[in-house]
């Protein structure tokens, strides 16, 4: 386990930390849900029709609740993921609601499991729910608890634009634009790069200069394919090319980043601060995109963002738009919030992206559920 430097600790004020020490974690409820996606998603990694969720509620001794959720790309693993959350909570039950301290405790307690994978996501669920509980207890939204002041977060649409026909992609892009969202991500992984160049060029021709495009290969290319395709995409003015190759091929990703004129984006499949540090030191990408669940929670996400800041790397979020908006509002090197509407029917406090931004409320905690 990577030791956290002092400058990456103490995410909140000493006054708030003192208040947290008097709040005791008492109970947890873990359930699952599989709401349908508003639009099925087809990527180079497969098709997604439902959002497989683990729903977590932690209650303090004084009855304050904190909520979080996890998204599982594979619904069959929901029982295992839910069980891991329950087991991990037993290790901190009865402790103070101090998310940073408790996350470090869990990482140390389970270090023989390697600190990655399902267990890391379990820690994340506890960490995020604990932060929500603390924010609600102190009457503060999380971005203010973390020292942020910006309430309008630049975002891009990621709710769809699956691999499909041009008419399907265009229809969805036009829907996004009708809501004022002209910044959007297109999934790639077509049989040939010629198809991809044609698709993107036609989108730009149809929609004009108003659109800003990112693309995502979802780890779908071989190294040779990635070099070939990134070169072919270089003249299209894309904001970034995301995860063209397997996420653990960080040395090859560094070579690709050096060769590509278009910025390379990765980070959603970095599962620890050690992996983040390695990627940053290698120069594996131009930008960083940690996933708040896979990295181990809000605590670890904010630490990763500080690490990126020292490398002068801009940070975007991956999924989880509700808590990610608070995270993005709290860092100085924020780039774009990934907005996906997958949970809009699950949580009454879900805030939609409009006009290329998500606007935070001043409600306490994360705000998954409106009071």
For each of these PLM feature ranges, what is it?
Residues 248-339:
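Catalytic alpha/beta core domains of metabolic enzymes, predominantly
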Residues 22-27, 59-137:
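Metal- or metallocofactor-binding catalytic centers and their adjacent structured scaffolds
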Residues 144-145, 150-260:
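Metal-dependent enolase-superfamily TIM-barrel catalytic cores that perform enediolate-based chemistry
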Residues 3-13, 23, 33-35, 48-53, ...:
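Flexible C-terminal active-site loop/helix
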Residues 68, 155-159, 184-186, 213-217, ...:
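Hydrophobic faces of well-ordered beta-strands that scaffold small-molecule active sites
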Residues 14-23, 27, 31, 136, ...:
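N-terminal amphipathic alpha-helix/helix-capping segment at the start of soluble metabolic enzymes
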């Amino acid at each position: 386990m990577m030791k956290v430097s002092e400058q990456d600790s103490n995410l909140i004020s000493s006054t708030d930390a003192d208040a947290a020490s008097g709040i005791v974690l008492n109970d947890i409820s873990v359930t699952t849900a599989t709401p349908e996606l508003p639009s099925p998603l087809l990527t180079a990694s497969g098709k997604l029709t439902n959002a497989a969720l683990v729903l977590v509620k932690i209650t303090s001794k004084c009855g304050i609740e904190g909520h979080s959720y996890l998204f599982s790309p594979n619904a069959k693993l929901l029982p295992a993921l839910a069980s891991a959350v329950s087991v991990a909570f037993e290790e901190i039950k009865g402790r103070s609601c101090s998310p940073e301290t408790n996350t470090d405790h869990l990482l140390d307690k389970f270090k023989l499991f390697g600190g990655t994978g399902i267990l890391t996501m379990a820690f994340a669920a506890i960490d995020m729910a604990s932060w929500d509980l603390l924010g609600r207890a102190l009457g503060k939204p999380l971005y203010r608890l973390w020292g942020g002041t910006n309430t309008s977060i630049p975002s891009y649409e990621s709710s769809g634009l699956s691999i499909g026909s041009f008419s399907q992609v265009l229809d969805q892009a036009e829907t996004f634009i009708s809501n004022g969202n002209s910044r959007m991500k297109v999934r790639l992984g077509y049989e040939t790069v010629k198809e991809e160049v044609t698709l993107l060029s036609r989108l730009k021709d149809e929609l004009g200069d108003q659109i800003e495009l990112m693309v995502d290969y979802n780890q779908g290319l071989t190294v040779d394919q990635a070099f070939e395709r990134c070169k072919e995409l270089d003249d299209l003015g894309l904001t970034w090319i995301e995860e063209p190759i397997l996420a653990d091929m960080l040395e090859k990703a560094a070579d690709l980043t050096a060769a590509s004129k278009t910025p390379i984006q990765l980070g959603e499949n970095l599962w620890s601060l050690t992996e983040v540090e390695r990627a940053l030191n290698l120069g594996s990408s131009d930008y960083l995109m940690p996933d708040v669940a896979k990295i181990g929670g809000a605590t670890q996400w904010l630490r990763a963002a500080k690490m990126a800041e020292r490398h002068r790397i801009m940070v975007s979020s991956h999924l989880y738009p509700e808590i990610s908006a608070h995270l993005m509002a709290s860092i100085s090197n924020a780039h774009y919030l990934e907005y996906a509407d997958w949970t809009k029917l699950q949580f009454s406090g879900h805030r939609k992206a409009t006009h290329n931004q998500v606007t935070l409320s001043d409600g306490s905690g994360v705000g998954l559920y409106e009071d």
